[in-house]
Amino acid sequence: PAGRRPPSAEPPLPHRWNLCHASQVFGQSVMQHTGSDVGLPHGKPHIPRRIEFTVHNDAPQTGEHGDCLLGELTDKGRKTMQHIGEALRARYVDAEHLLPPNLAKEDARSLYLRSTHMSRTIQSLEELVRGLVGPNAVSTPEILVRNTFDEDLLPNPRKCPKLGVLMQKFADLAVDVYNPRLAKYDDVVAPLDGGAAPRLNDGPRLSGLFDTMRSATAHGIQLPQSLENPELQTLMEHAVLDEWFGGYASRDPDERRQYRRMALGTFFESLCDTFARRATLGDADPRRMSILLGHDATLVGMTHMLDVCNHRWPAFGAGLGLELFRDRSSTEPATAQHMPGYYVRCRYGDEELRLPGCQASGKHWSGRPELCTLDAFREIVVDRLRHPQGLTIQQECTM
């Protein structure tokens, strides 16, 4: 989790989490030079890793084998991601045959894998891929990572300064709404947290405490009884959700569209282009599956864009699946502007979602409201969010 630890909590929340044994060895990444060639040494010996801690002004201390870095993927997290990969294999390889059972090098273009640049998401995707391809894969697919400035899997205020201004506006609004409500629990939280009151913006931030509490619960670490209060936990959850994501639900429809457009508009444009390429090229398009590893901000933002947000923080390992279907009885050809006979189904975990924007007649498969027409799906996440003066997202971001 994040680095927040209530210093006076009882039972105490440990500063060091010994839950990362799978990360205690590094594959050697030192390059060897052989003439004009540069490559990895044969055998690739493993180098043990231990974490060095500093506590106040004391001399640095060496942690135990298996201690975690802040925010690091734990052993349990690795197993969870492998299980997710195995579930995807059972569904899309064994049952649907989207990929061959033993992935070979010539199948590389059928599977698109991308992660944000953070080590936790890269490691998560690596574990997922191990579960997906199975033990008999002939070839290991590559994972793509973008530089921070080019990232579109989550809102990117570095690339879009105007978005950063809007994000701060809604964070400030959340402070005005929730800090007075949180004050009700000052006597509960402050004694555990070195006298710090629970606030979104003052001193130790509430989001850090909330993250630590969720991580502790997920790993079987007991919270102080006073922090187990369901009303307190719900209030904290809603406060942090509004602080981070309030702009997606702005009451001003123009501002709401602008926020969504600048936050995840580029990502959804790319996603719809991928669907359109499949619809227009058919089997000539080699890609059969894409797996993208993002963050809570990715998942919550996507559900807001689709108007299906449940206003809960995503569980660890939560995912949103978008499946493209074709009506083989449709004979009308698909074009970039109109893609008849193609449908999108959204799945949040095992739940099939009914998108509000697809419920009108003609915007879903008759009798199957969860199957949104591809045209209607694009209208929801791209067309209706376009800038009224026709500016591109890049132009709007730098205005």
Feature-to-residue mapping (PLM):
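Signature for phosphate-centric chemistry
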Residues: 1-112, 116-290, 294-399
